[in-house]
Amino acid sequence: MYVAVKGGEAAIDAAHKLLAHRRRGDPAVPDLTVTQIREQLALAVNRVMSEGSLYDPDLAALAIKQARGDLIEAIFLLRAYRTTLPRFGHSEPMETGAMRIHRRISATFKDLPGGQILGPTFDYTHRLLDGGLADGIAIDEPDRVPGEPEIVAPRVVTHLDRQGLIEADDTAADDQPVGDVTREPLSFPSDRDVRLQALARGDEGFLLSLGYSTQRGHGRTHPFAGEIRMGEVDVFFSPEELGFDVPLGSVTLTECEMINQFKGSQTAPPQFTRGYGLVFGHSERKAISMALVDRALRASELGEETGAPAQDQQFVLPHLDNVQATGFVEHLKLPHYVDFQAELVLLRQLRSEWEAAQNTATKPSAGDTQDVVRDEAEAAE
């Protein structure tokens, strides 16, 4: 338990001023603009939007600047701002199959309808520091094909679906209510729609560790990356007073469909199963990790053995939110004076009782004293 502390307002005000000074850095260096962060630190912006549950690159960039680059603090800032926004309703389900693709790869099929598109990726870089970036050397323009149309391609799993080799998509019916982890507390067991929401806004590092654990034998499902795609998807909203869909714009998404082995059961034939990941922006690592953990959490419903951490809803879901985790861990910095004084009183009492017991155990009895005197007398003779 921590308690309120009186006083310290002047110190807190001074700390805020010092924080602003440290955030600005050397005044001789040009100030870092929100536009620069948005355009040149886009992957950090994407993570803040994803885990902050708010798609707004400018606000995410502002949060990163305000947090001095601490992404979890930036996520906290964005979520706090999100709570002040009015909610007009839900958008229509997005059709990621109509995504305007910037990157698309598959680890299961070499030749795909629509082809594989490497796009912007670190996958084949040599991981050597580029001194040219420090010197501000101009970057070559990417190769472009004049008049190149936007690329739209069908999903890879559609090919397996037509052959009945993969489980049917369990997309909820349009009239079935969907949970909302931002308004309703988690309950167990959680349905898959709730789990996917929690995973989508969960901490990337925690998901990465859980996904990695499944590859080291703790809930292994032998996954294949069926398809990873990144691109823009249109968002539609249907106002009640209009009765038809209105386009609101587009968002950049990364989608991962993982294909996993399944030996079958008494009610289901041997077939592939699905793991799914979908996140804001370009964030393949998180989308892959999300798909791995999604599939691991389905072990019980598929009749598989459970016991691994990644398969336990009550371990995964309550612990993957980095804002909650940060609040609980960092609250240890707050005053705990009363608790600690109580611990001190208890410890001193226990020490006093222990010392008394030790003195009693080591104090010689009357018989022992007589034996000692007799031994000394015999030694003197």
Task: Label each PLM-derived region with a short phrase.
Residues 87, 93-153:
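Helix-turn-helix/homeodomain-like alpha-helical modules used for DNA recognition
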Residues 1-50, 99-119, 123:
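N-terminal, Lys/Arg-enriched amphipathic/low-complexity engagement segments
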